[in-house]
Protein backbone atom coordinates (compact mmCIF):
# COMPACT_ATOMS: atom_id res chain seq x y z
CA UNK A 1 0.00 0.00 0.00
CA UNK A 2 1.83 3.10 -1.22
CA UNK A 3 0.00 5.77 0.79
CA UNK A 4 -2.23 4.40 3.57
CA UNK A 5 -4.19 7.07 5.47
CA UNK A 6 -2.52 8.12 8.72
CA UNK A 7 -5.49 6.99 10.82
CA UNK A 8 -5.07 3.42 9.55
CA UNK A 9 -1.35 3.18 10.35
CA UNK A 10 -1.85 1.89 13.93
CA UNK A 11 -3.92 -1.00 12.57
CA UNK A 12 -1.29 -1.87 9.98
CA UNK A 13 1.56 -1.52 12.48
CA UNK A 14 -0.20 -3.92 14.85
CA UNK A 15 -0.23 -6.64 12.22
CA UNK A 16 2.92 -8.80 12.56
CA UNK A 17 2.64 -9.85 8.92
CA UNK A 18 2.95 -6.29 7.59
CA UNK A 19 5.96 -3.97 7.37
CA UNK A 20 5.25 -0.25 7.74
CA UNK A 21 8.07 2.11 6.80
CA UNK A 22 8.57 5.58 5.35
CA UNK A 23 10.49 5.11 2.11
CA UNK A 24 10.48 8.74 0.98
CA UNK A 25 12.78 10.84 3.13
CA UNK A 26 11.83 14.05 1.31
CA UNK A 27 8.17 13.51 2.01
CA UNK A 28 5.46 15.62 0.41
CA UNK A 29 4.89 19.36 0.25
CA UNK A 30 1.32 20.63 0.45
CA UNK A 31 0.92 24.07 -1.10
CA UNK A 32 -1.54 26.89 -1.71
CA UNK A 33 -1.42 28.53 -5.11
CA UNK A 34 -3.08 31.89 -5.90
CA UNK A 35 -4.16 32.98 -9.36
CA UNK A 36 -2.34 36.23 -10.08
CA UNK A 37 -4.60 37.06 -13.05
CA UNK A 38 -7.93 37.58 -11.29
CA UNK A 39 -8.74 40.48 -9.00
CA UNK A 40 -8.31 40.86 -6.13
CA UNK A 41 -5.56 38.19 -6.18
CA UNK A 42 -3.76 40.25 -8.81
CA UNK A 43 -2.78 42.51 -5.89
CA UNK A 44 0.32 41.13 -4.16
CA UNK A 45 -0.95 42.44 -0.82
CA UNK A 46 -4.07 40.32 -1.10
CA UNK A 47 -2.02 37.25 -1.98
CA UNK A 48 0.30 37.82 0.95
CA UNK A 49 -2.64 38.41 3.27
CA UNK A 50 -4.03 35.00 2.35
CA UNK A 51 -0.65 33.38 2.98
CA UNK A 52 -0.14 35.21 6.28
CA UNK A 53 -3.53 34.05 7.53
CA UNK A 54 -2.55 30.39 7.41
CA UNK A 55 -1.18 28.39 10.33
CA UNK A 56 0.76 25.37 9.06
CA UNK A 57 0.15 23.38 12.22
CA UNK A 58 -3.60 23.69 11.78
CA UNK A 59 -3.32 22.47 8.19
CA UNK A 60 -1.09 19.53 9.08
CA UNK A 61 -3.15 18.50 12.08
CA UNK A 62 -6.18 18.26 9.81
CA UNK A 63 -4.33 16.53 6.99
CA UNK A 64 -2.08 14.15 8.94
CA UNK A 65 -2.91 14.42 12.64
CA UNK A 66 0.25 12.68 13.81
CA UNK A 67 3.06 15.15 14.65
CA UNK A 68 5.72 12.51 14.03
CA UNK A 69 4.64 12.44 10.38
CA UNK A 70 4.87 16.13 9.58
CA UNK A 71 7.18 19.15 9.73
CA UNK A 72 6.39 22.82 10.05
CA UNK A 73 8.40 23.85 7.00
CA UNK A 74 8.52 27.05 4.98
CA UNK A 75 11.37 25.97 2.72
CA UNK A 76 10.12 26.08 -0.86
CA UNK A 77 12.83 23.62 -1.86
CA UNK A 78 11.99 21.21 0.99
CA UNK A 79 13.40 21.07 4.52
CA UNK A 80 16.55 19.04 5.20
CA UNK A 81 17.90 19.48 1.67
CA UNK A 82 20.97 21.46 0.54
CA UNK A 83 18.75 24.34 -0.65
CA UNK A 84 16.54 24.54 2.44
CA UNK A 85 16.18 28.02 3.91
CA UNK A 86 13.67 29.82 6.13
CA UNK A 87 14.03 33.14 4.28
CA UNK A 88 10.65 34.77 3.76
CA UNK A 89 8.72 32.10 5.64
CA UNK A 90 9.10 33.38 9.18
CA UNK A 91 5.48 34.47 9.65
CA UNK A 92 4.09 31.42 7.87
CA UNK A 93 5.99 28.92 10.00
CA UNK A 94 5.30 30.80 13.23
CA UNK A 95 1.58 30.74 12.48
CA UNK A 96 1.13 34.22 13.93
CA UNK A 97 0.29 36.21 10.82
CA UNK A 98 -3.35 37.12 11.50
CA UNK A 99 -2.67 40.75 12.37
CA UNK A 100 -0.32 41.07 9.40
CA UNK A 101 -3.02 39.63 7.15
CA UNK A 102 -5.64 42.06 8.47
CA UNK A 103 -3.26 45.00 7.95
CA UNK A 104 -2.52 43.94 4.38
CA UNK A 105 -6.23 43.65 3.61
CA UNK A 106 -6.83 47.13 5.00
CA UNK A 107 -3.89 48.56 3.07
CA UNK A 108 -5.11 46.97 -0.15
CA UNK A 109 -8.66 48.23 0.39
CA UNK A 110 -10.16 44.75 0.18
CA UNK A 111 -13.87 45.22 -0.49
CA UNK A 112 -15.23 41.81 0.37
CA UNK A 113 -14.97 40.31 -3.10
CA UNK A 114 -15.47 36.55 -2.63
CA UNK A 115 -12.31 34.50 -3.10
CA UNK A 116 -12.98 31.37 -5.15
CA UNK A 117 -11.07 28.55 -3.45
CA UNK A 118 -11.44 25.21 -5.21
CA UNK A 119 -12.07 22.25 -2.90
CA UNK A 120 -11.54 18.71 -4.21
CA UNK A 121 -13.66 16.44 -2.05
CA UNK A 122 -12.81 13.05 -3.56
CA UNK A 123 -9.08 12.86 -2.71
CA UNK A 124 -8.28 12.12 0.95
CA UNK A 125 -4.93 13.92 0.87
CA UNK A 126 -6.45 17.10 -0.62
CA UNK A 127 -9.87 17.57 0.94
CA UNK A 128 -8.85 18.81 4.41
CA UNK A 129 -6.51 21.69 3.56
CA UNK A 130 -9.01 23.92 1.71
CA UNK A 131 -11.43 23.80 4.65
CA UNK A 132 -8.71 24.90 7.10
CA UNK A 133 -7.35 27.57 4.76
CA UNK A 134 -10.82 28.93 4.01
CA UNK A 135 -11.58 29.35 7.72
CA UNK A 136 -8.20 30.98 8.39
CA UNK A 137 -8.88 33.46 5.59
CA UNK A 138 -12.38 34.19 6.89
CA UNK A 139 -10.96 34.81 10.35
CA UNK A 140 -8.86 37.72 9.03
CA UNK A 141 -11.64 39.26 6.95
CA UNK A 142 -11.77 37.46 3.63
CA UNK A 143 -15.04 36.34 2.12
CA UNK A 144 -14.37 32.86 0.75
CA UNK A 145 -16.39 30.93 -1.81
CA UNK A 146 -15.31 27.35 -1.11
CA UNK A 147 -16.35 25.51 -4.26
CA UNK A 148 -16.64 21.73 -3.84
CA UNK A 149 -15.75 19.60 -6.86
CA UNK A 150 -13.98 16.40 -7.80
CA UNK A 151 -10.27 16.46 -8.55
CA UNK A 152 -10.67 16.03 -12.30
CA UNK A 153 -12.98 19.04 -12.43
CA UNK A 154 -10.39 21.06 -10.50
CA UNK A 155 -7.62 19.97 -12.87
CA UNK A 156 -9.68 21.18 -15.81
CA UNK A 157 -10.76 24.41 -14.14
CA UNK A 158 -7.30 25.43 -12.94
CA UNK A 159 -6.04 25.46 -16.53
CA UNK A 160 -8.48 28.27 -17.35
CA UNK A 161 -7.30 31.88 -17.39
CA UNK A 162 -10.93 33.05 -17.51
CA UNK A 163 -12.26 35.81 -15.30
CA UNK A 164 -14.28 34.93 -12.22
CA UNK A 165 -17.45 35.99 -14.03
CA UNK A 166 -16.65 33.45 -16.72
CA UNK A 167 -15.97 30.58 -14.33
CA UNK A 168 -12.40 31.35 -13.27
CA UNK A 169 -10.77 30.86 -9.89
CA UNK A 170 -8.58 32.53 -7.27
CA UNK A 171 -6.81 29.73 -5.41
CA UNK A 172 -6.33 25.99 -5.10
CA UNK A 173 -4.30 23.60 -2.96
CA UNK A 174 -2.31 20.61 -4.10
CA UNK A 175 0.50 18.31 -2.97
CA UNK A 176 3.89 17.57 -4.46
CA UNK A 177 6.38 14.77 -3.95
CA UNK A 178 9.44 16.42 -2.40
CA UNK A 179 11.66 15.45 -5.33
CA UNK A 180 9.37 17.43 -7.66
CA UNK A 181 10.01 20.73 -5.88
CA UNK A 182 13.47 20.45 -4.32
CA UNK A 183 15.28 22.86 -6.64
CA UNK A 184 14.33 25.94 -8.70
CA UNK A 185 14.38 24.06 -12.00
CA UNK A 186 11.83 21.39 -11.11
CA UNK A 187 9.66 23.48 -8.77
CA UNK A 188 6.83 24.68 -11.04
CA UNK A 189 5.57 27.21 -8.50
CA UNK A 190 8.68 29.40 -8.88
CA UNK A 191 8.26 29.55 -12.64
CA UNK A 192 7.89 33.28 -13.29
CA UNK A 193 7.00 33.20 -17.00
CA UNK A 194 3.47 34.45 -16.51
CA UNK A 195 0.67 33.70 -18.97
CA UNK A 196 3.04 32.40 -21.62
CA UNK A 197 4.83 29.37 -20.24
CA UNK A 198 4.04 29.66 -16.54
CA UNK A 199 2.29 27.09 -14.36
CA UNK A 200 -1.34 27.50 -13.24
CA UNK A 201 -1.61 30.81 -11.38
CA UNK A 202 0.74 32.43 -13.88
CA UNK A 203 2.89 34.81 -11.81
CA UNK A 204 4.93 37.09 -14.06
CA UNK A 205 8.24 37.60 -12.25
CA UNK A 206 11.11 38.15 -14.74
CA UNK A 207 13.72 38.47 -11.97
CA UNK A 208 12.98 34.93 -10.81
CA UNK A 209 13.43 33.67 -14.36
CA UNK A 210 16.83 35.36 -14.53
CA UNK A 211 17.81 33.68 -11.28
CA UNK A 212 16.57 30.28 -12.44
CA UNK A 213 18.78 30.60 -15.51
CA UNK A 214 21.70 31.56 -13.28
CA UNK A 215 21.01 28.52 -11.12
CA UNK A 216 20.97 26.25 -14.15
CA UNK A 217 24.36 27.48 -15.33
CA UNK A 218 26.03 27.59 -11.92
CA UNK A 219 28.51 24.83 -11.13
CA UNK A 220 29.02 25.77 -7.48
CA UNK A 221 26.75 24.43 -4.74
CA UNK A 222 27.45 27.49 -2.58
CA UNK A 223 26.40 29.77 -5.41
CA UNK A 224 23.32 27.64 -6.09
CA UNK A 225 22.33 27.95 -2.43
CA UNK A 226 22.57 31.75 -2.63
CA UNK A 227 20.55 31.84 -5.83
CA UNK A 228 17.89 29.52 -4.42
CA UNK A 229 17.62 31.67 -1.30
CA UNK A 230 17.11 34.79 -3.40
CA UNK A 231 14.48 33.03 -5.51
CA UNK A 232 12.61 31.97 -2.37
CA UNK A 233 12.82 35.49 -0.95
CA UNK A 234 11.31 37.01 -4.09
CA UNK A 235 8.72 34.23 -4.42
CA UNK A 236 7.43 34.98 -0.92
CA UNK A 237 7.49 38.73 -1.52
CA UNK A 238 5.50 38.28 -4.73
CA UNK A 239 3.10 35.76 -3.21
CA UNK A 240 3.85 33.25 -5.95
CA UNK A 241 2.84 30.38 -3.69
CA UNK A 242 3.15 29.11 -0.15
CA UNK A 243 4.24 25.72 1.18
CA UNK A 244 1.76 25.01 3.96
CA UNK A 245 3.52 21.97 5.37
CA UNK A 246 5.76 18.98 4.78
CA UNK A 247 4.44 15.53 5.60
CA UNK A 248 5.42 11.90 5.31
CA UNK A 249 3.40 8.85 4.30
CA UNK A 250 4.78 5.45 5.37
CA UNK A 251 4.14 2.62 2.95
CA UNK A 252 2.90 -0.81 4.01
CA UNK A 253 3.61 -4.19 2.47
CA UNK A 254 3.45 -7.88 3.23
CA UNK A 255 6.42 -9.44 5.02
CA UNK A 256 6.51 -11.95 2.19
CA UNK A 257 8.17 -9.24 0.07
CA UNK A 258 11.89 -8.50 0.29
CA UNK A 259 14.09 -5.85 -1.29
CA UNK A 260 11.70 -2.89 -1.11
CA UNK A 261 13.89 0.18 -1.74
CA UNK A 262 13.88 3.67 -0.25
CA UNK A 263 13.33 6.48 -2.73
CA UNK A 264 11.35 9.62 -3.58
CA UNK A 265 8.84 7.48 -5.51
CA UNK A 266 7.96 3.77 -5.52
CA UNK A 267 10.54 1.52 -7.17
CA UNK A 268 9.23 -1.75 -8.54
CA UNK A 269 12.53 -3.48 -9.09
CA UNK A 270 14.76 -5.42 -6.68
CA UNK A 271 11.66 -6.94 -5.04
CA UNK A 272 11.35 -10.66 -4.45
CA UNK A 273 8.64 -12.74 -2.83
CA UNK A 274 9.48 -15.37 -0.25
Please name every model-derived segment.
Residues 2-7, 70, 102-178, 187-188, ...:
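Ligand/substrate-recognition segments at binding pockets and active sites
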Residues 3, 7, 11, 45, ...:
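Extracytoplasmic/secreted proteins, especially bacterial periplasmic and envelope-associated proteins
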Residues 6, 14-17, 26-72, 112-126, ...:
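Alpha-helical secondary-structure segments
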Residues 9-22, 165-168, 182-197, 254-258:
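Ligand-binding "clamshell"
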Residues 28-33, 198, 267-269:
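Small-molecule pocket liners
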Residues 45-48, 145-155, 184-255:
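Extracytoplasmic/peripheral linker and loop segments enriched in polar/acidic and small residues
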Residues 68-107, 123-128:
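Structural transition elements
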Residues 251-274:
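Long beta-strand-rich cores associated with HINT superfamily self-processing modules
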Amino acid sequence: WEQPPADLLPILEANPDITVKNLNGLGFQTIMRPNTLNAPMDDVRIRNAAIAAVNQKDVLDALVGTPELYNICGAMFVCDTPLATDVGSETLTAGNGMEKAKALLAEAGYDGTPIVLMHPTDVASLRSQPVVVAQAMRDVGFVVDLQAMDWQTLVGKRASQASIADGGWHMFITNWVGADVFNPLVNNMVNGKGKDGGWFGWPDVPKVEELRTAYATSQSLDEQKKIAEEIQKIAYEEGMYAPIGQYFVPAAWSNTLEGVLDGPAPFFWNITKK
